[in-house]
Amino acid sequence: MKRQLTLAQYRSVDLTLFAVILAVCEYVITLAAIRWFPGQLYTVSLTAALCAIVLMRWGAWAGLHAVLGGAVFWFASGGTPQQLVIYGIGNLGCLLVLPLLRGNGKEKIRRDKLFTALFALAVLLAMQLGRAAVALLLGTPWQTCVGFFTTDALSGVFAMVVVSLAGRLDGVFEDQKRYLHRLQEQQKKEKGGF
């Protein structure tokens, strides 16, 4: 007899897989940028893209990935304790986009390619806003905080592309409760059930 996962077990496995993907990719990307392009003003990060996907799939659980992405970036770049706070806590700014997902928001964002790309960009901008706010609270000059928006510009394009591609794959950029329900309905139809 097949043993099915509970929703909580499925969510735990799903969140863990996305966390591992995020940690490995962010670490490699950060090390590559530091070693191969040390003088570059721009950075690329996968954190916003994966947080946008997890926000769509599980909502506020994406906060775990936001903090993880900041911590991995901090660790790989050899940052200061203050930078850990700025990136770890500041990335939680991505949760500011949660109101966009209420009601029919998830479906509208998921189904419309423009809204999908704009959602990914909104997640990145909210993270940058969070980092800037935390940095300002820690006494960082505002001119330095502007750098959170300018140096991460490529990450915005990257996030829009990654999330748009994820939207083309069945169930990847979709609320998982809805996705599992949809799969269950399809299986019933295929078996000739009600």
Predicted segment positions?
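Hydrophobic transmembrane alpha-helices
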Residues: 1-57
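Membrane-helix boundary elements
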Residues: 65-86
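Residue-level recognition of pore/gate-forming positions within transmembrane alpha-helices
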Residues: 23-27, 70-71, 91
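Membrane-helix interface "capping/anchor" motifs
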Residues: 53-67
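Membrane-embedded alpha-helical hairpins and interfacial helices in multi-pass inner-membrane proteins
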Residues: 31-41, 80-90, 100-194
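Alpha-helical transmembrane segments and their membrane-interface exit regions
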Residues: 51, 91-99
